[in-house]
A protein has these predicted regions:
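Aromatic-lined carbohydrate-recognition surfaces of secreted/lumenal glycan-active proteins
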Residues: 3-12, 61, 132-181, 196-200, ...
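An active-site-proximal structural segment forming one wall of the substrate-binding cleft
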Residues: 77-107, 144, 184-189, 252-253
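Active-site groove signature of glycoside hydrolases
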Residues: 89-138, 256
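Active-site-adjacent "subsite" loops/lids of carbohydrate-active enzymes
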Residues: 46-95
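Substrate-binding cleft of secreted/luminal carbohydrate-active enzymes
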Residues: 3-5, 192-210, 214, 218-256
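The substrate-binding groove and active-site-proximal loops of carbohydrate-active enzymes
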Residues: 11-13, 32-40, 70-82, 134-142, ...
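Distinct, well-ordered alpha-helical segments
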Residues: 17-21, 172-188
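Aromatic- and acid-rich polysaccharide-binding/catalytic face
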Residues: 29-40, 179-210
Length: 256
C-alpha cells in the first residue's frame, strides 16, 4: 500500500507565491498528496495560493498559527486567543471562497518560553521558577484543555476534520497517565481526528532515525524532515535533510 503524503509548508507570503507559481504544482495531484499550509497571515496573496491548489485538485489543510508575539504555536499560554484566530480564519475563508481538507493545530510550547529556555545560562533561576509554578498549576491545564476541546467541537460542527501536530513526548505522558510535561512546558493532549507526531530527525542528528523507530508505531501519522520557514529561534540545528536522509526517513516512516 502506498503511503499518503502531506507536505508541510510554513513560508512567508512572497516565497510561498514563488514556490507555487511553477507548473509542477500538478505533480502534487499525481502523487495524491496533500499540503498542510501554515496560515502565517490572512492576506489576499496567501488566499490566491490556496485557490491555485484548490483548482489543481490538491487537498489543503489549514495549519493555524498565531503571530509570534502571541506565541506562534498553540499552547496552554494562549488558549484564549485560539477562538479569535479561528473566527478570523473563517471570515477570510468565506471572503475568498477557499476550500479546506481539514484544520491543523500545532501544539508546542509558547515561543517566548523556548527563547527563555535557550537563554538558560543567563536566566536559569527565572526559567526554573516559571516551570515550577506551571507544574503546580493544575487549573491552568484543565481550563486550557476545555477551551481547546470546545474549539475542536466547533471546528467539527463547521464540517472540518481536525489534526494536531504534537511532540512525540505526548505519547509518554499518555502511557504513564501523567500531565507533568504538559503543565511544565505548556503542551496539551487533545482528542482529534488525526494526531501527527513530529519526529523531525533533522533536529536530532545523528540520532534522528531512532526517534522515528521509537515513536512511529504510536502515531496515526508521522512528521519527518524539517518544515523550514516560520520562526527560527536558533535553538536547534535546522539544516534541511539531504536526499539520503529524507529517503531514509521516508522508508522508516513507511514501516508504520
Amino acid at each position: 500500500m502506498k503511503p499518503h503524503l502531506t507536505f508541510f509548508c510554513q513560508l512567508e507570503t512572497p516565497v510561498l507565491q514563488a514556490l507555487f507559481s511553477v507548473p509542477d504544482i500538478a505533480y502534487l495531484g499525481e502523487l495524491n498528496a496533500s499540503v498542510s499550509l501554515g496560515i502565517l497571515d490572512l492576506s489576499q496573496e496567501r488566499a490566491e495560493v490556496v485557490k491555485r491548489l484548490n483548482e489543481a485538485g490538491v487537498p489543503v489543510i489549514a495549519w493555524l498559527l498565531l503571530p509570534k508575539e502571541q506565541g506562534h504555536w498553540f499552547s496552554l499560554e494562549n488558549a484564549d486567543l485560539a477562538f479569535d484566530r479561528y473566527q478570523n480564519f473563517l471570515a477570510w475563508t468565506e471572503t475568498n471562497g477557499l476550500q479546506w481538507a481539514g484544520i491543523g493545530l500545532d501544539i508546542e510550547p509558547d515561543v517566548s518560553f523556548i527563547e527563555e529556555f535557550h537563554r538558560l545560562s543567563v536566566s536559569r533561576s527565572r526559567i526554573l521558577m516559571k516551570i515550577l509554578r506551571q507544574v503546580f498549576d493544575r487549573r491552568r491545564l484543565t481550563r486550557a484543555r476545555k477551551v481547546y476541546r470546545d474549539l475542536i467541537l466547533r471546528m467539527k460542527a463547521d464540517g472540518y476534520k481536525v489534526d494536531t501536530y504534537q511532540f512525540p513526548f505526548i505519547v509518554d505522558e499518555r502511557k504513564s497517565s501523567s500531565t507533568l510535561l504538559q503543565r511544565a512546558v505548556g503542551m496539551v493532549d487533545l482528542p482529534v481526528d488525526r494526531e501527527v507526531l513530529m519526529t523531525f530527525s533533522s533536529y536530532l542528528r545523528p540520532y534522528g532515525p531512532g526517534f522515528i523507530w521509537s515513536y512511529g508505531q504510536d502515531g496515526a501519522s508521522i512528521g519527518i524532515g524539517s518544515t523550514g520557514g516560520g520562526v527560527d529561534l536558533g535553538v536547534l540545528e535546522t539544516r534541511p535533510l539531504t536526499w539520503k536522509e529524507l529517503s531514509r526517513d521516508l522508508r522508516l516512516a513507511w514501516v508504520y
